């Protein structure tokens, strides 16, 4: 048990942990149901707070669009990469809560659990049938090859006169 109680509830925020940043809910402690509360919008609840904070870089090279997501502590089996309607890349995953044993005494809980999901609309030149994904050291890399840009055939016209 911590010597200093946490009066604010929940886990402490850590800017380096994408699963620890909580979304503030101004209606959370109201004693009555509210249509704007997280109960009405579960996708914005504390359990899904990592949705907001998962960091993703997107760069475009001459050959491909490359997405890199920081997802430390997850195995590749806990991450999904999907293409929806041939135009939306979706990266999602979930870190589950560690099983509790009744004989265990927890002194500190800083590693958090939760879900994340990020969606990106792909440009027209994306070859969605050739997408590849890999994961190494907590970084997911998704590579979406691009269609080759056809250079227009230019024909010079001689000007008479």
Curated annotation (Swiss-Prot):
GO BP: any one term: protein complex oligomerization
Protein location: Cytoplasm
Residue span(s) of domain sHSP: 47-161
InterPro entries per record: A-crystallin/Hsp20_dom, HSP20-like_chaperone, Small_HSP
Keyword Cytoplasm assigned: yes
Coiled coil ranges: none
Pfam annotation, one family: HSP20
PROSITE patterns assigned: SHSP
GO molecular function terms listed in the Swiss-Prot or TrEMBL record: unfolded protein binding
Main location as per UniProt: cytoplasm
Keyword annotations: Cytoplasm, Stress response
A GO cellular-component term linked to this record: cytoplasm
Domain of life: Eukaryota
Quaternary data: Forms oligomeric structures.
Protein's recorded name: 18.5 kDa class I heat shock protein
Gene expressing this chain: HSP18.5-C
């Amino acid at each position: 048990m911590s010597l200093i109680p946490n009066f604010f509830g929940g886990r402490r925020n850590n800017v380096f942990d994408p699963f620890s940043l909580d979304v503030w809910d101004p209606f959370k402690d109201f004693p009555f149901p509210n249509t704007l509360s997280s109960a009405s919008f579960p996708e914005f609840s504390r359990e899904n707070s990592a949705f907001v904070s998962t960091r993703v870089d997107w760069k475009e090279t001459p050959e491909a669009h490359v997405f890199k997501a920081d997802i430390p502590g997850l195995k590749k089996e806990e991450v999904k990469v999907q293409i929806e309607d041939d135009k939306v890349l979706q990266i999602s995953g979930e870190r589950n809560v560690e099983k509790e044993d009744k004989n265990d005494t927890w002194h500190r809980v800083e590693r958090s659990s939760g879900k994340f999901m990020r969606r990106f609309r792909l440009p027209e030149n994306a070859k969605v049938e050739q997408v590849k994904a890999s994961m190494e050291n907590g970084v997911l890399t998704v590579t979406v090859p691009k269609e080759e840009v056809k250079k227009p055939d230019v024909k010079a016209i001689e000007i008479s006169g």
